[in-house]
Amino acid sequence: MAPLSAALLPWHGVCVPVCYGESRILRVKVVSGIDLAKKDIFGASDPYVKLSLYVADENRELALVQTKTIKKTLNPKWNEEFYFRVNPSNHRLLFEVFDENRLTRDDFLGQVDVPLSHLPTEDPTMERPYTFKDFLLRPRSHKSRVKGFLRLKMAYMPKNGGQEEENSEQRDDMEHGWEVVDSNDSASQHQEELPPPPLPPGWEEKVDNLGRTYYVNHNNRTTQWHRPSLMDVSSESDNNIRQINQEAAHRRFRSRRHISEDLEPEPSEGGDVPEPWETISEEVNIAGDSLGLALPPPPASPGSRTSPQELSEELSRRLQITPDSNGEQFSSLIQREPSSRLRSCSVTDAVAEQGHLPPPSVAYVHTTPGLPSGWEERKDAKGRTYYVNHNNRTTTWTRPIMQLAEDGASGSATNSNNHLIEPQIRRPRSLSSPTVTLSAPLEGAKDSPVRRAVKDTLSNPQSPQPSPYNSPKPQHKVTQSFLPPGWEMRIAPNGRPFFIDHNTKTTTWEDPRLKFPVHMRSKTSLNPNDLGPLPPGWEERIHLDGRTFYIDHNSKITQWEDPRLQNPAITGPAVPYSREFKQKYDYFRKKLKKPADIPNRFEMKLHRNNIFEESYRRIMSVKRPDVLKARLWIEFESEKGLDYGGVAREWFFLLSKEMFNPYYGLFEYSATDNYTLQINPNSGLCNEDHLSYFTFIGRVAGLAVFHGKLLDGFFIRPFYKMMLGKQITLNDMESVDSEYYNSLKWILENDPTELDLMFCIDEENFGQTYQVDLEPNGSEIMVTNENKREYIDLVIQWRFVNRVQKQMNAFLEGFTELLPIDLIKIFDENELELLMCGLGDVDVNDWRQHSIYKNGYCPNHPVIQWFWKAVLLMDAEKRIRLLQFVTGTSRVPMNGFAELYGSNGPQLFTIEQWGSPEKLPRAHTCFNRLDLPPYETFEDLREKLLMAVENAQGFEGVD
């Protein structure tokens, strides 16, 4: 019962999708085929044509119809007519010719992809003045064998009168969103079709491998589907010049000094309700005088908005320039503007008391109802909702939440009890935003306790005790849901949220909810009875078939999904799509070549309870690493699974758990958490053959990347930089050990002479402390203001490189036996992490959007609705276990579920109806398919799904 964006009505061979926006009715006549390819044994074919209307930029299909089949001919004559309502600017028609087969799949005979922007329009005074055109049939891929032509007639119906007027009369009597167009196939008169206009200078027409025509602009290196014209190019250049002039005028206007006079906003004509604009205040420092500027509110109609030049001229006439202005004039102005005072009360009070403070300038920012001031809700090209913060010009996938932020810091600029309502934002974990500990008292302090704390931290970098000098003690606490005990979230002056840990008296930019392992971020699953009330404007009702559905009276739509389960805190962070990474990955896969002189597959038969040692012996016994590039074939003892990708994915998952387990002493957790891994510098004390094991781990990592699988583990960022041979900097220390980072940063920004530091480090091993010189005779060289940068570089080199150099070399030896290191270097350290380990978070919305259904299931089927409700009610750990149960891995590819791979290439997550309600669900990991019985109640589905996920182990059949 989701809202309809397009309705489709076939009627007497007529197909009219009703699309909102600028649209026209297109008459298409499939006349005949000429000299088609021979596909049948007896030298003929049974051709028919399939017509697909789709959106060019999104490749989203809007309508699909086909002609009748003409038997045993290579020159069929269909003479069938269709009508489409299209948007000429971004719609295209795809004609595909097939040879019908009763027993096997229909053979492909060719295709034609036609843009709709330059088709002619019929003249009502003449009868069918448009003529046919023969289109060359093009192949779908390089393997397609096609020939011949497709003869078509295409023209737009006139905009006024005729067919569309009749349709508008019929449409008044019908339900909204549907339209009927009569089919009328009469004789046509031929006339010569005008050739398309010439391309502008610098443009080129090309055809892609699907036979679609596109146009290349060599001037600005862009491509597009619709044919450009000289008028488009000239208007584009005019727009660019106009935009440059507007920006210049805007800069000139902003550089002027204005004093605002008492301007009352004019009410909109006709009682129109204005757009939801809010007035926010922004402090502006201008040397010399204290100046204020009040802009008039924008008009209600978007079409009447003025340009910056007009705005500048209007304000120049209405504003007065007064050289001896003061804060009292501005204060009185704000008091006469109650709407402005509500949003800038604290600033106004400060101006009233201190005349020398600069007054705020008032700006108008578009605000979406229900969001904090300055926030706007938008949708991207893929239909995903995101939020724009006009206050600090940032965007986020997470909906901002309104909460009161109490400022308890001393020395505030305002003495008023009124405070701005600021949004509290839960942002997804950024791949390149390590933990930053704010330590203003530490940086500016000169007393001996601070110096002693810095020296203690440097002498023992692995100390887990936090420094008490990192942040002032707040006077107020604001409790927020989902945060760990003792944590608080606030907003910095630049609008960026930061987090306060009252347990250790530290602050950080990174969300503490994302510092825990994925499976620990939510302790328990949700209960359907504990979801709370529905959002404002929503209503819950029962359908005739007994199912519950929900009505949104705000937007007048209905849906099956519970809106309370669409909270980003429940669905998970959105997947950040990266087109650049996709291009690099495709290039990387093309360069990987499988040797010709190796077996068809590399087999391993293992026991689950001894997977680490058996895998080590089997892989290290291979003398020629190229053999590992053959297809992996994994078998677990006493299991009958046939490995077509799923068993291998589970092998990588299980082996990762063992290899990276700190119990074996090869890796250890980093200083800041218990899930990010780093190489253990003392691994040789735990295992004499540790270098051989690191070579084995390198081979496994290379195997995973070569075969497109993912490892289950996170490493610190310097680990990936060492793999790429990049220089490790002080900023890399920040995400690993923030306390040690703060100490080194303090040295960098201050004179360290008084600390009495030497070019040596105290290292503690098993209770004993050893002194390590950073350079020869380092214990005799003092750290001064002149050599402090060299000291910091040596500390970082020792901390991340020197101690683990042998282990890293062994790891790279195994890794480069399968993958050339030069090919890996096309990625940066962030992309290399995604290449090896993928994403750990599960975005349920992305998961649901890229799922397909078979054997009677569809998105609105009750069982499918219950399934996704059960997934949304799961905690993060159970979602990952469900993903691992169906796909064999707990990781998600870089660009989300759209890039899931199966045994034969890309394979979306699939749910197929199977079995009876008494059976448990079963999975086929090689096909990413879940066989889900048609359960009769939600409780039954949830119980049996969890039972299958938590208790199933092993393979049988094809996986």
UniProtKB/Swiss-Prot annotation:
Principal localization? cytoplasm
PTM comment for this protein?
A: Phosphorylated; which impairs interaction with SCNN. Interaction with YWHAH inhibits dephosphorylation. Auto-ubiquitinated.
Domain named HECT is located at 624-958
Which proteins does it associate with, and in what oligomeric form? Interacts with UBE2E3. Interacts with NDFIP1; this interaction activates the E3 ubiquitin-protein ligase. Interacts with NDFIP2; this interaction activates the E3 ubiquitin-protein ligase. Interacts (via WW domains) with SCN1A. Interacts (via WW domains) with SCN2A. Interacts (via WW domains) with SCN3A. Interacts (via WW domains) with SCN5A. Interacts (via WW domains) with SCN8A. Interacts (via WW domains) with SCN9A. Interacts (via WW domains) with SCN10A. Interacts (via WW domains) with CLCN5. Interacts with SMAD2. Interacts with SMAD3. Interacts with SMAD6. Interacts with SMAD7.
Gene3D superfamilies membership: 2.20.70.10, C2 domain, Hect, E3 ligase catalytic domain, Hect, E3 ligase catalytic domains
Domain WW stretches: 197-230, 369-402, 481-514, 532-565
Species of the source: Pongo abelii
- Protein name, please? E3 ubiquitin-protein ligase NEDD4-like
Summarize what activates or inhibits it. Answer: Activated by NDFIP1- and NDFIP2-binding.
Q: Where is this region: Disordered?
A: 183-206, 248-275, 289-316, 408-478
| InterPro entries documented for this protein | C2_dom (IPR000008), C2_domain_sf (IPR035892), E3_ub_ligase_SMURF1 (IPR024928), E3_ubiq-protein_ligase (IPR050409), HECT_dom (IPR000569), Hect_E3_ubiquitin_ligase (IPR035983), WW_dom (IPR001202), WW_dom_sf (IPR036020)
| Listed EC numbers | 2.3.2.26
Q: Where is the composition biased (Basic and acidic residues)?
A: 444-455
Q: Sorted alphabetically, which Pfam families does this protein's record hold?
A: C2, HECT, WW
